[in-house]
Every structure is written in C-alpha cells, then in structure tokens.
C-alpha cells in the first residue's frame, strides 16, 4: 500500500484544494461564508476520502463517497462561474484538473469492482 500523499490523485486533489482556497478568498462577503465555505469543505472531504480509500481494505465505499462529493463540487464550481464569482478562464483551468482527478478515481474504483 502506497502512502496516500504519494498517490498522483492525492497530489492533484491537493493542488485543486489550494486553487479553491485562493479562488474563494476573492468572493464577496455574500458568497464567501456560504458557497465559499461549502466549496472548501467539499474539497477537504475529497482528501479525506482519498486517505480512507488508501487506508482501508474495502476501498469501494470511500471511492463512491469521493465521487459523490466530487459531483457536488463540480456543480458548485459551475454555479460560481455562472454567478461570475470566478472567471471563465479559471473555471476552464479547474475543469482540466477536475477531469484528471475524475479519471483517476473512476479507474481506481473500476479496478476495485473487478
């Protein structure tokens, strides 16, 4: 079992969280303590799920939890883009990272099902 912080998906999720904290710090007060807090919390939940999936023998429940939180985070970021809280360019940059993370976790989950 690899250490969770050596996993490529962990490194990508960590990079995403750093970006999320930077992006949400620029939100207006109306959104910073509602949508911004939810985004940061959901990002941190992703790291917890990676840690737990790597730690436990039965990885599937943790990977499924990750994918659930991941979909919510994608929705929140799309809402931010629609509300002009983040630029279209920043949303595109985050989408590339999200796509990479999604592919890695989906492949990991599919490997557990077989």
How does the language model describe each region?
Residues 1-114:
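Amphipathic alpha-helical assembly/interaction segments
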């Amino acid at each position: 079992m690899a250490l969770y912080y050596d996993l490529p998906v962990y490194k990508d999720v960590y990079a995403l969280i750093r970006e999320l904290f930077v992006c949400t710090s620029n939100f207006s007060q109306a959104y910073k303590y509602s949508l911004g807090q939810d985004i940061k919390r959901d990002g941190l939940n992703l790291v917890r799920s990676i840690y737990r999936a790597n730690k436990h023998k039965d990885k599937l429940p943790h990977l499924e939890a990750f994918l659930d939180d991941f979909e919510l985070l994608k929705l929140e970021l799309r809402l931010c883009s629609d509300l002009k809280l983040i630029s279209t360019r920043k949303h595109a940059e985050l989408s590339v990272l999200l796509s990479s993370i999604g592919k890695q976790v989906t492949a990991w989950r599919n490997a557990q099902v077989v």
